[in-house]
A protein has these predicted regions:
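Aromatic-lined, polymer-binding surfaces characteristic
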Residues: 474-496
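Membrane-interfacial loop-to-helix junctions in multi-pass inner-membrane proteins
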Residues: 456-460
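Aromatic-residue-lined binding/catalytic grooves and analogous aromatic/hydrophobic interfacial grooves
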Residues: 1-429, 435, 444-448, 461, ...
């Protein structure tokens, strides 16, 4: 029988970093488990700011031989200055990942509710200021089933919520038991509409900045007392809540895409949606386990207390098992067949301009995301990376020709939603490193070694040969008979 691995806590999350993650590859959610105000921070993998731009520096090909000669003569400072001017892309930055929206559940427990003005943008807030006295509090993420649960007693009333992100139905689903509540959709910027769709459905829509994708989140509730006033959805003491999302990256008609998913989920009903989700998720998690035979009694400690205890040097084999399972859970949550690959934050992001833009940092971070894919029996979770290599390849061919006068294709240390392969930033230890495509192509070989899927290898072999062709054209034969790549770097290392 498979062990039920859980992360659990005896208090709500006060900030985004200690909320608990759900994911179905395309959508992500961070659940806070609030007592009066439940915040669920939502992401959609294709919600990015801006469209594709050809950023190749028009002077790159002209000055590349000069940079190489300066490096050969050990005139490093001069080479760096010229590279910054001639090889840096114009502009120097790719596009960045964004937030989808917040789903907010505000319980109406007889006290004067906080005004809606305070709900406009919860990003970055200390959520503990919204909490109220409760007893018996517990929030838990069941990694084995992929379900988040929170329970507590408030004003002598038992409150229970559970939620998950479904792969089969492609929706976020929640079951609520507690006080009557109002349900809100909010986003801090780039919002065009927050509208009533019908008496049990609301939507939020907009565009992720100038040239960015158009996005939509649509939320529907089922249960007694459900109604909409303005753009606020009201639910009774017991209700099922579903949320679907779509962007123009995949769909021409976002409203129709969201409605279709909501109609299917509500027609099937919460019990069936949950059963399908749990069956699919458990099958993934059951493929690989790590047994270190920890002390079962330690499972009764909240996870944050176990981590503190472990940090003090106390053994906890069960915690190591738990985090092994959690690592597999996270990859399955942010990378599924047909989705975009895991980005710098997997899929979970609470910022309109996240650290390093939340892109794909391909001078080790993206590779690290997928190092566990094959060996931990998550082989199909690797596929989004190969799909993205296919998106990158034509842009990488343009960069190879435009910057280097070379055949094949090249990528530098970052790429984005559109597969941009031109250099990113003006940071000498990383920007001019040209081995991103070649390194990522090693993952094609790794996938083949584990699957022996000859059709897959045939379909992707040209990506590998194209990455090799670039170096056949650009590798420089030194006087000692060795080949070198110039300019390049050991990623993010500097001269001392």
């Amino acid at each position: 029988m498979m062990k039920q691995y859980q992360l659990w806590y005896d208090a709500p999350a006060k900030d985004w970093n200690i909320a608990l993650p759900l994911g179905n590859g395309r959508m992500g959610a961070m659940v806070f488990g609030g007592t009066v105000l439940e915040r669920i921070s939502l992401n959609e993998d294709s919600c990015w700011y801006g469209g594709f731009r050809d950023r190749v520096n028009p002077d790159a090909k002209k000055y590349l031989p000069v940079v190489r000669q300066l490096l050969k003569e050990d005139r490093i400072a001069e080479a760096q200055q010229l590279a910054e001017e001639a090889l840096t892309a114009t502009p120097d930055g790719e596009r960045h990942y964004e937030v989808l929206c917040d789903l907010i559940l505000q319980q109406l427990d007889g006290e004067t509710p906080e005004g809606l003005h305070g709900m406009r943008n919860l990003r970055g807030q200390d959520m503990s200021r919204h909490e109220r006295p409760v007893s018996g509090y517990r929030r838990a993420l069941d990694i084995t089933d992929g379900v988040h649960q929170v329970s507590y007693v408030r004003k002598e009333k038992q409150i229970r919520r559970e939620c998950f992100l479904s792969v089969p139905h492609q929706v976020f689903a929640m079951h609520h038991e507690g006080f009557s509540s109002r349900v809100l959709l909010r986003r801090g910027a780039y919002v065009n509409r927050i509208d009533k769709v019908d008496e049990h459905t609301i939507l939020l829509s907009g565009q992720a900045g100038d040239g960015g994708v158009q996005y939509m989140a649509m939320c529907r509730a089922v249960g007694e007392g459900v109604h909409v006033i303005g753009n606020t959805l009201h639910i009774g003491e017991t209700a099922d809540i579903y949320l679907a999302s779509a962007t123009s990256y995949r769909f021409a008609d976002l409203r129709a895409a969201c409605l279709s998913r909501l109609e299917t989920a509500t027609a099937d009903g919460y019990a069936a949606v949950k059963a399908a989700h749990v069956a699919e998720h458990r099958a993934v998690m059951a493929r690989c386990t790590l047994a270190l035979h920890g002390e079962d009694a330690l499972d009764n400690l909240p996870t944050d207390q176990r981590l503190a205890r472990y940090a003090q040097g106390n053994a906890d084999n069960g915690l190591e098992e738990l985090y092994f399972a959690f690592g597999r859970y996270l990859l399955a949550g942010c990378s599924r067949p047909g989705t975009l690959p895991a980005n710098l934050q997997g899929i979970w992001n609470d910022d309109f301009h996240p650290a390093w833009d939340g892109k794909y940092t391909i001078n080790i971070n993206t590779e690290m995301n997928y190092w566990c894919a094959e060996v931990c029996n998550l082989s199909e979770m690797h596929l989004p990376l190969f799909d993205h290599l296919r998106r990158m390849q034509p842009h990488g061919a343009q960069v190879a020709l435009g910057m280097y006068g070379a055949n094949g294709w090249v990528a530098h240390h970052n790429t984005d939603l559109w597969g941009d392969c031109a250099p990113q930033d003006t940071y000498c230890p990383a920007t001019y490193w040209p081995m991103g495509a070649a390194w990522l192509c090693l993952h094609i070989a790794e996938h083949y070694r584990y699957t022996l899927d000859a059709d897959f290898l045939r379909a992707n072999y040209d990506l590998m040969t194209g990455a090799a062709d670039f170096f056949l054209d650009t590798a420089i034969l030194r006087e000692d008979g060795m080949y070198t790549v110039s300019p390049s770097s050991s990623p993010e290392n500097v001269y001392i």
